[in-house]
Amino acid sequence: MNNSINHKFHHISRAEYQELLAVSRGDAVADYIIDNVSILDLINAGEISGPIVIKGRYIAGVGAEYADTPALQRIDARGATAVPGFIDAHLHIESSMMTPVTFETATLPRGLTTVICDPHEIVNVMGEAGFAWFARCAEQARQNQYLQVSSCVPALEGCDVNGASFTLEQMLAWRDHPQVTGLAEMMDYPGVINGQNALLDKLDAFRYLTLDGHCPGLGGKELNAYIAAGIENCHESYQLEEGRRKLQLGMSLMIREGSAASNLNALAPLINEFNSPQCMLCTDDRNPWEIAHEGHIDALIRRLIEQHNVPLHVAYRVASWSTARHFGLNHLGLLAPGKQADIVLLSDARKVTVQQVLVKGEPIDAQTLQAEESARLALSAPPYGNTIARQPVSASDFALQFTPGKRYRVIDVIHNELITHSRSSVYSENGFDRDDVCFIAVLERYGQRLAPACGLLGGFGLNEGALAATVSHDSHNIVVIGRSAEEMALAVNQVIQDGGGLCVVRNGQVQSHLPLPIAGLMSTDTAQSLAEQIDALKAAARECGPLPDEPFIQMAFLSLPVIPALKLTSQGLFDGEKFAFTTLEVTE
């Protein structure tokens, strides 16, 4: 990371400097002092005793030498442990189905003071207007919401229909925005490796910022070439040796634990005292139900400590300081003089029990955040409007003809993983030779009037009914899986009627549905209401069979061509290892 860019994110006036230094010297009154607290030392391990002194947005000093410092207000930490605010190194807020405003309300009281967002979900639907809205939300947020400029819209050129483009010229207009930290995940890794000029132009344009990667399972010379292009990190690693090799070659490793992709158990054994500055935590995609019931980055820290015996200072280091350094946010990530006062007070550091949160030097009150949510959302001017340009469908739209004795490709799902396997199944007059095979279809929703792309899905666990959604990465067309064409059509028509959303159909009836009026991706409901609705959706989905833990999130990745091995886009069946379209019938 080029630390010469730190000035971009660390705005402090000369007057603020003078006031801060006066308090640091002991010549002026602090705004806040946190007493009766121990500070977890992320650098040396152990703890630092003594108060934390705050002036404005910044920490003026820490330690016993400030015990008698006067302050306008004192906070009794009651013996709590203080750690830096948590940082999510990579996520798509849209995948939480919450607006950035609602997301802040749900996660800031849990200690998540900083997020590095890639809003490419909404940018794929509505282009620069979606990015501009995210920037407006970030500008007014208490939470530090930083943005990586979406690099691959669509994820892979020529493989899917999406709603908008995001040109290099448009991207450059946002490069110097104070909330922008770099270039978001470069998903077209074959294009980068092969030196496609359009992709290298993007990397060159953002080279003085952070360049995010995306290269699941990549190794050998190809991985070397990808890193040689300037890519600095990857959040897609899912195997221990894969993660180790990326670290050896100089990449920073983002350890992901989301609602669908669960890589923490595989990668946590890599973390040690030596490489932890190169390791970070991220969620990528996490829904409101999990946030409400399990947590966010706090849940990942808890698992590192309890399940993987990671030392406290290392677990909290990878959740804050490592990420801050990687993105050049050197005013964040430590509880030290001159750093921004983003502080989490923990009544139990091992269990990550959050007692109180301060951000930019101010205590956070969850009830105040909730009370202000509606007004702040309105102030951001959300991009409302129906983005579903698709007429209702009928069962005949999903008709597939199979020949007995022929072999057909099946997208084989791995529960709680984003990768799939490519398998095959033989058709007979009695059906397929695997009883777990159901149907999948992707319907473009941007007015192109294409016929549905249809395929076969195995391993998902759907024994009856149908699920449909307008959340399908990254182009966010309509994806539907089902056992019958009639129920698939019913589910699709419900999400069309809702202007986007999620739906469960069983026994010929809609059992549960959730409208998502912003870009077919996000709701304007509160986090609690969303969590309750998702709970109802999941309960209805469970009646359809032994589905993945997060069926809609897992289903959303079945159309993402940049993650292997076999996916279905609006253009057809795509081989994510050969990076080429293939046929449903196996003819080789």
From Swiss-Prot:
SUPFAM superfamilies per record: Composite domain of metallo-dependent hydrolases, Metallo-dependent hydrolases
Alphabetical list of InterPro entries matching this protein: Adenine_deam, Adenine_deam_C, Amidohydro-rel, Metal-dep_hydrolase_composite, Metal_Hydrolase
The enzyme's E.C. designation: 3.5.4.2
Cofactor(s) recorded in Swiss-Prot or TrEMBL: Mn(2+)
KW Manganese (keyword) present: yes
Keywords: Hydrolase, Manganese
Listed Gene3D superfamilies: Metal-dependent hydrolases (3.20.20.140), Urease, subunit C, domain 1 (2.30.40.10)
One function term, GO molecular function aspect: adenine deaminase activity
Gene Ontology biological process terms, A to Z: adenine catabolic process
Catalytic activities: adenine + H2O + H(+) = hypoxanthine + NH4(+)
PANTHER family linked: ADENINE DEAMINASE (PTHR11113:SF2), N-ACETYLGLUCOSAMINE-6-PHOSPHATE DEACETYLASE (PTHR11113)
Family label: Belongs to the metallo-dependent hydrolases superfamily. Adenine deaminase family.
Known partners and oligomeric status: Homodimer.
Full protein name: Adenine deaminase
Source organism of this protein record: Shigella flexneri
Source organism phylogeny: Bacteria, Pseudomonadati, Pseudomonadota, Gammaproteobacteria, Enterobacterales
